[in-house]
């Protein structure tokens, strides 16, 4: 080890002064997973206890074999995506930094057992429980030290002081939910979410409310839609009131087996201690972000659309539900693809079935001046907008429409367009949006106007 390398975390510095500052910081570093692994491994060897091998690749063979034998469609349908070692390591490192030493560990959807095997290696004295619904995965998992159950996690009962894993994520069909699940996940006053119920929210809510011991830790890999999706506002409210967020990070896309999903790491401790990683808007809405401090700083002293007398709503035409009205001429229908860097590009359509005009539509038309903003499709988000002064047109549902609530407020549309082109607006959107789209409510009440 060099004289400029930290003897705890292994980080190397170019100057001794940097190392000294690192050691004297308020929150001292702790041993990362690779050092914990080595310590546990050596302890077991010294004691003559059989030990588990430390994996040297991102996925164990059982994960690779199962992934190659299962169709992409089925994996997507059941939300089965295995977690690479480098991602698992980060979660375990963060738990180590928190001083977690669990007695009982639960993985609620253990898949091929990657997390269970890591947990057994890192916490050899802990009791392990694993639940898996898929019978093939259950049969293939090689972790005899764990108490494994093949069942639907929604039916499982038990307690743990550490819950860890990568729960499935896919949209549930409401007609498949039980009466209890509909109350929690599909009702207007849902305790966990509104709108379309996603299985990962169901797992998260059940773990926090039924299984996690007081002061216990939950460490999950879940979609970034938890950051700001309006459907999950109740879940964020619960997290803010009943837990402490210890760590949040957005993951880079590569690593998972074809998930096509932006994901995040989150570590929660049951019990309220502080508001780290929480961004609360002036209207009281709760959001989660690794950039919460930057969001507070950038919005300080700014106004919103609502402050300027402007409102926002979503376009009222779903094009594939009005195919019989699509035409080569008639009333203009503006799609999100028509919005291109503050300009309206007519005939810039995606897909052969779409047409730029509609006929015989009974829906009310829009009339300018209005600002049209691309709402997003749930992937990467581009903050595109255009000022439109046409007298009669429609906007599809992937567009948010900014409108003046009074004649006097119409003058502020130009102020908003200038603000949207400010680089600070792009920064805010990058830090704030986790699900690849922005709601009309967020546009009206949160996006800062510079």
Name each model-derived stretch.
Residues 1-8, 12-36:
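C-terminal recognition-helix end and immediately following basic linker
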Residues 76-92, 103, 109-126, 131-145, ...:
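Signature of N6-adenine DNA methyltransferases within the class I
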Residues 298-450:
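Polybasic, glycine- and aromatic-enriched phosphate-binding surface used to engage nucleic acids
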Residues 150:
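Conserved residues in the N-terminal Rossmann fold of short-chain dehydrogenase/reductase
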Residues 72-77, 189-190, 396-403:
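Glycine- and acidic
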Residues 40-98:
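S-adenosyl-L-methionine
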Residues 97-103, 121, 155-159, 325-328, ...:
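Flexible, charged surface loops at secondary-structure boundaries
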């Amino acid at each position: 080890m060099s004289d400029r390398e930290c003897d705890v975390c292994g980080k190397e510095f170019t100057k001794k002064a940097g190392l000294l500052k690192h050691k004297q910081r308020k929150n001292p570093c702790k041993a990362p997973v690779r050092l914990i692994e080595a310590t546990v491994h050596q302890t077991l060897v010294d004691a003559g206890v059989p030990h588990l091998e430390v994996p040297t690749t991102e996925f164990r063979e059982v994960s690779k074999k199962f992934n190659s034998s299962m169709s992409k469609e089925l994996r997507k349908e059941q939300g089965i995506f295995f977690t690479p070692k480098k991602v698992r390591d980060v979660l375990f490192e963060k738990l180590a930094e928190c001083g977690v030493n669990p007695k009982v560990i639960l993985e609620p959807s253990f898949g091929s057992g990657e997390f269970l095997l890591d947990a057994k290696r890192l916490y050899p004295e802990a009791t392990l429980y694993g639940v898996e619904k898929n019978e093939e995965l259950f049969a293939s998992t090689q972790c005899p030290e764990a108490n494994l159950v093949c069942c639907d996690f929604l039916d499982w009962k038990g307690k743990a002081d550490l819950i860890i894993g990568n729960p499935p994520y896919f949209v549930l069909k409401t007609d498949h939910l039980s009466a209890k699940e509909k109350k929690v996940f599909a009702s207007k006053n849902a305790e966990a979410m509104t709108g379309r119920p996603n299985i990962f929210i169901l797992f998260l809510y059940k773990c926090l409310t039924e299984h996690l011991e007081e002061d216990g830790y939950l460490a999950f890999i879940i979609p970034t839609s938890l950051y700001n999706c309006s459907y999950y506002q109740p879940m964020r409210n619960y997290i803010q009131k009943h837990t402490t967020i210890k760590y949040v990070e957005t993951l880079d896309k590569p690593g998972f087996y074809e998930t096509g999903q932006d994901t995040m790491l989150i570590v929660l401790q049951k019990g309220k201690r502080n508001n780290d990683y929480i961004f609360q808007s002036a209207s009281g809405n709760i959001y989660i972000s690794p950039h919460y401090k930057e969001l507070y700083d950038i919005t300080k002293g700014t106004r919103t659309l609502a402050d300027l007398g402007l409102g926002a709503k979503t376009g009222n035409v779903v094009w594939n539900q009005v195919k019989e009205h699509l035409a080569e001429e008639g009333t203009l229908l503006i799609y999100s693809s028509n919005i291109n860097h503050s300009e309206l590009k007519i005939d810039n359509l995606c897909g052969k079935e779409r047409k730029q005009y509609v006929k015989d539509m009974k829906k009310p038309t829009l009339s300018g001046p209005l600002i049209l903003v691309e709402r997003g499709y749930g992937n990467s988000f581009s903050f595109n907008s255009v000022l439109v002064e046409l007298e009669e047109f429609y906007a599809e549902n992937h567009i948010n429409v900014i409108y003046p609530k009074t004649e006097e407020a119409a003058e502020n549309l130009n102020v908003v367009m200038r603000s949207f082109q400010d680089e600070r607006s792009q920064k805010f959107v990058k830090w704030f949006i986790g699900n690849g789209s922005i709601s009309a409510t967020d546009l009206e009440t949160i996006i800062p106007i510079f």
